[in-house]
Each structure stands twice: as structure tokens, then as C-alpha cells.
């Protein structure tokens, strides 16, 4: 029998317990500090706690920051603040429109605003009174606002009122965060699926369909000089009637189409070329940005640019020459052997936004849309 009795306590385990209790106390104090340091009204971190402060809606023209916005839902919820031009459209599944894209929940129901991961704001629908027509200024944390316009800067009012509100841009400009052109060319996946051009169906020479007739505009002045040397059939208000549903049938009778833009801005190449001319198999005669700008999206022999001629009279002479020389005229269609034109749709544009939001969680602020969109 051991005369010394029970062994004495081992003190090292008490020191370990004290160390663990101290670390636990430090952790509790740290997280309590973070909790009370948050803004009770918005849930947004106060300045100084994070390197980046997410935008809460108040304009800040001097800030452009990055952070990580974690979607609040497994499927992204995208709110259309208004339907484009107040006209509802069908919204198919994005996975069916864009290969490899997961579906987003896209809706125009404004009641989901507090839960939306992103809000798309169509400029035309809010531009006359941005202060009253924009979404609520205090947004949910991490929610991204997307500025969307297919109109040119000449027809976008009050851009300066939007400084600091938006996180992404979406437009026909190729340097937009979300590029949504009016049209594009893509390669045929197999043999071209269209019949050869039937020249015998091209019974007329030059057409122009115009709805926004401004006598002092550059395009109307050029037309007036051109028609002094060449017959041009003009359709639209105060001109030849063009009943709804007959546009392509009518324009397809013409060899050339005046794809004259209503204003001149970088990348502003609209349905006047992609739909009115190319879908009608008419050679587009373009007035808009520079030839080099057009050639970023089209082969150089797919169109005729007014800048290639010293005067409208010279252009008229050239079109008359092509009218008589079938081989030269048909050379403007060679690109169709390998490429086909495609046109935009609202649904496809919204699915491009869906894809962008899935691919990039970076949170930024657009300092000035007015300074960029020129």
C-alpha cells in the first residue's frame, strides 16, 4: 500500500483551460463589435470597417469600388423595373436561349424589389423624371442596378442625374458591361440554308423607311441631295404608306436600302441595317459612324458607306453602275456564303444580363454614365 496516498493534482491542464477561455472571450468581444458596428437601418457596413462600402442608392460620383456580392438566392432574381417602352414581352427560359447559361428568375413584379439580386432599369422609361421614376434609393445590400438603353445619347435625357446610382451598363456600345447590339453576324453551322439571291425579284432600286422625319437632320439633308440625282422611294409618315406586316415584302423588291441613322455615335448601328436592309436582302447604304466602326461588325464588302464618296452625286452614279453590273452587285452578298445576320430580342438581352450576373460577382459603381455614354 502506497503510504503517500492519492497523487497531487497536475497543474498544466488548468493553464490550457485558462488559455481557451481567454480566446473565447476575445472572439465574443470581436464579433460583438462587428455586430454593433453595422448600420441598423440598412444593414450596410459603416465606412472604415470594410475596404469597400456597397452602394445604398445615394449618388456618389467619386467612387468606383469592387467587392463581392453574394447572390441571395440559388437562382438569381432579376427585376425589370419597367417593361421596355411599357410593353410586356414573353420571357422564355434563358437556358433555352443561351447555351450554358443557368436560368434566372426574371420578372417585372416590383413587389420583389427587396429580394431582387439585380434590377434592370430601361432608361427611356425613367428619363423624363429620374428622381421619381428610379427604384427606391435605399437598396438591399449587394443588389446591383443595371442601366439599359438601346437609344443613342442624342435621345437619352437627364443622364447626369444617374451619376453614382448604377453598377453595370447594358447597351449597344461594345464597351458596355453587358453588350446588347442590334444585330451581329455568326457563322453557318453547316451549309447556308437560304436560296441564292433572285435578282429578277429586285425590280426597284433604292428605298428608305423613316418614321422620325426631321428636315434639318444630317440624314434628311443627304437624302435630299441624293434624290436630285437618283430616284429614292421613301416610306413612312407623310411618305409612301407601309402597312404593318408588309415591310420585308416591300423592301425586298429593292436592290439598295438607305440605312441612315438618326444620330451619329460610336457603335450606334441599328435595325435600319440589321433588319430593314439585311433581312430584305438589300445592300445597305449607310450613314452613321465611320466605315472603320462598321467594319468591326461587318465585312467591308457587305455595305456601302456614304463617306466613300465625295458627294451624293458620286454615290448616285455608283449605285446606277451597280444596277447595270450584276456581277459587281452580287459581290456584296459573298459574305452570306459563310455568315448569317441575326437580330436582337428583348428576351435575349435580358438573358445576357442573367449570364453576366452569374459569371461576375464584382460589385462596382459607374461614376458617370453621362461622361461615358457619348
UniProtKB/Swiss-Prot annotation:
UniProt-annotated glycosylation sites, renumbered to this chain: 60, 105, 167, 198
Subcellular location field: Golgi apparatus, Golgi stack membrane
One cellular component term from this protein's GO annotations in UniProt: Golgi cisterna membrane
Lumenal compartment spans: 35-374
Catalytic reactions on record: a beta-D-galactosyl-(1->3)-N-acetyl-beta-D-glucosaminyl derivative + GDP-beta-L-fucose = a beta-D-galactosyl-(1->3)-[alpha-L-fucosyl-(1->4)]-N-acetyl-beta-D-glucosaminyl derivative + GDP + H(+); an N-acetyl-alpha-neuraminyl-(2->3)-beta-D-galactosyl-(1->4)-N-acetyl-beta-D-glucosaminyl derivative + GDP-beta-L-fucose = an alpha-Neu5Ac-(2->3)-beta-D-Gal-(1->4)-[alpha-L-Fuc-(1->3)]-beta-D-GlcNAc derivative + GDP + H(+); an alpha-Neu5Ac-(2->3)-beta-D-Gal-(1->4)-beta-D-GlcNAc-(1->3)-beta-D-Gal-(1->4)-[alpha-L-Fuc-(1->3)]-beta-D-GlcNAc derivative + GDP-beta-L-fucose = an alpha-Neu5Ac-(2->3)-beta-D-Gal-(1->4)-[alpha-L-Fuc-(1->3)]-beta-D-GlcNAc-(1->3)-beta-D-Gal-(1->4)-[alpha-L-Fuc-(1->3)]-beta-D-GlcNAc derivative + GDP + H(+); a beta-D-galactosyl-(1->4)-N-acetyl-beta-D-glucosaminyl derivative + GDP-beta-L-fucose = a beta-D-galactosyl-(1->4)-[alpha-L-fucosyl-(1->3)]-N-acetyl-beta-D-glucosaminyl derivative + GDP + H(+)
Enzyme class: transferase
Residue ranges, Cytoplasmic side: 1-15
Protein name stated in the entry: 4-galactosyl-N-acetylglucosaminide 3-alpha-L-fucosyltransferase FUT5
Source organism phylogeny: Eukaryota, Metazoa, Chordata, Craniata, Vertebrata
Amino acid at each position: 500500500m502506497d503510504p503517500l496516498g492519492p497523487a497531487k493534482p497536475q497543474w498544466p491542464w488548468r493553464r490550457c483551460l485558462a488559455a481557451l477561455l481567454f480566446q473565447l472571450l476575445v472572439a465574443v468581444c470581436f464579433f460583438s463589435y462587428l455586430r454593433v458596428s453595422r448600420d441598423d437601418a440598412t444593414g450596410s457596413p459603416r465606412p472604415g470597417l470594410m475596404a469597400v462600402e456597397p452602394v445604398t442608392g445615394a449618388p456618389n460620383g467619386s467612387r468606383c469600388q469592387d467587392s463581392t456580392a453574394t447572390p441571395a438566392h440559388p437562382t438569381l432574381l432579376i427585376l425589370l423595373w419597367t417593361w421596355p417602352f411599357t410593353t410586356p414581352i414573353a420571357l422564355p427560359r434563358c437556358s433555352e436561349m443561351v447555351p450554358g447559361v443557368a436560368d434566372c428568375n426574371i420578372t417585372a413584379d416590383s413587389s420583389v424589389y427587396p429580394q431582387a439580386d439585380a434590377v434592370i432599369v430601361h432608361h427611356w422609361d425613367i428619363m423624363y423624371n429620374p428622381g421619381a421614376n428610379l427604384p427606391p434609393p435605399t437598396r438591399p445590400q449587394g443588389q446591383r442596378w443595371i442601366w439599359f438603353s438601346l437609344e443613342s445619347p442624342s435621345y437619352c435625357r437627364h443622364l447626369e442625374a444617374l451619376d453614382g446610382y448604377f453598377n453595370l451598363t447594358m447597351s449597344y456600345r461594345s464597351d458596355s458591361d453587358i453588350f446588347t447590339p442590334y444585330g451581329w453576324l455568326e457563322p453557318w453551322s453547316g451549309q447556308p440554308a437560304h436560296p441564292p439571291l433572285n435578282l429578277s425579284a429586285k425590280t426597284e432600286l433604292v428605298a428608305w423607311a423613316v418614321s422620325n422625319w426631321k428636315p434639318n437632320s444630317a440624314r434628311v439633308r443627304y437624302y435630299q441631295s441624293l434624290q436630285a440625282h437618283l430616284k429614292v422611294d421613301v416610306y413612312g409618315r407623310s411618305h409612301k404608306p407601309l402597312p404593318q406586316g408588309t415591310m420585308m415584302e416591300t423592301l425586298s423588291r429593292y436592290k439598295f436600302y438607305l440605312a441612315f441613322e438618326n444620330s451619329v455615335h460610336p457603335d450606334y448601328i441599328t435595325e435600319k441595317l440589321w433588319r430593314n436592309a439585311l433581312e430584305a436582302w438589300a445592300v445597305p447604304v449607310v450613314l452613321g459612324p465611320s466605315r472603320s466602326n462598321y467594319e468591326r461588325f461587318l465585312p467591308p464588302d457587305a455595305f456601302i458607306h456614304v463617306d466613300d464618296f465625295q458627294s451624293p452625286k458620286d454615290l448616285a452614279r455608283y449605285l446606277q453602275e451597280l444596277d447595270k453590273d450584276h456581277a459587281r452587285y452580287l459581290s456584296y452578298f459573298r459574305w452570306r456564303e459563310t455568315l448569317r445576320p441575326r437580330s436582337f430580342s428583348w428576351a435575349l438581352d435580358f438573358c445576357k444580363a442573367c449570364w453576366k450576373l452569374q459569371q461576375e460577382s464584382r460589385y462596382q459603381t459607374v461614376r458617370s454614365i453621362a461622361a461615358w455614354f457619348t
